[in-house]
């Protein structure tokens, strides 16, 4: 086999491997997608709730590579079918918003939605994630707005340096007028790779299936 043919075959196999890299699975009623590139695994689920103007995505990252990588929520974006991009916000921005506008209901929704997703998914074992952050976040702060901000600071994905073998998880907040993300692409530029996950509008898919069953 010539060197050229070898290179072409390698490229084809690489593209095929990437096309099949997305793993779909379900846990406790939530749907997850996962992908591993360069030894770093990214897993996510769309949380079935929103806080204020934000659509929320739970993201978990596990560094199985041989070098350290820094991950942050700003690495995440959502591309709509028309090409419009929705950039995920830094954790500090979300926390400040909830200090200004948050309430008791926001605290309850945040904690309930995130913990239900996290604790019912046996695939997530973070070394630097929510469980380690929450210990100091939920002290008696008095104000419901401060409690909402504390909940967000514990739950939100924050800028984290992951050494080989380390992992983290957190919620990523997308400003989307309080609506679900819907159909599009979830894009994460992390660990020197670009993770692209196609998304479908769950409501639209359900309606399509119902119409398909009509004789």
Protein language model annotation of sequence segments:
Residues 1-5:
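Positively charged n-region of N-terminal signal peptides that target proteins for export
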Residues 6-14:
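Bacterial N-terminal signal peptides
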């Amino acid at each position: 086999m010539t060197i050229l043919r070898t290179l072409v075959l390698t490229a084809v196999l690489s593209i095929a491997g990437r096309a099949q890299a997305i793993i779909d699975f379900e846990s406790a009623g939530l749907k997850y997608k996962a992908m591993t590139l360069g030894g770093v695994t990214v897993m996510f689920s769309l949380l079935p709730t929103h806080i204020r103007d934000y659509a929320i995505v739970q993201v978990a990252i596990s560094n199985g590579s041989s070098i350290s990588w820094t991950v942050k929520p700003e690495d995440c974006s959502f591309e709509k079918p028309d090409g419009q991009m929705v950039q995920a916000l830094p954790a500090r921005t979300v926390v400040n918003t909830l200090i200004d506008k948050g309430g008791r209901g926001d605290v309850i929704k945040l904690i309930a939605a995130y913990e239900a997703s996290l604790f019912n998914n046996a695939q997530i074992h973070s070394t630097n994630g929510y469980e380690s952050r929450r210990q100091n976040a939920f002290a008696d702060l008095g104000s419901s707005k401060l409690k909402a901000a504390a909940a967000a600071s514990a739950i939100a994905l924050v800028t984290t340096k992951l050494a080989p073998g380390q992992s983290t998880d957190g919620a990523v907040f997308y400003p989307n007028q309080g609506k679900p993300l819907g159909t599009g692409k979830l894009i994460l530029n992390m660990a020197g790779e670009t993770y692209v996950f196609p998304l479908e509008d769950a409501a639209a898919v359900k309606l399509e299936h119902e119409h398909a069953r009509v004789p």
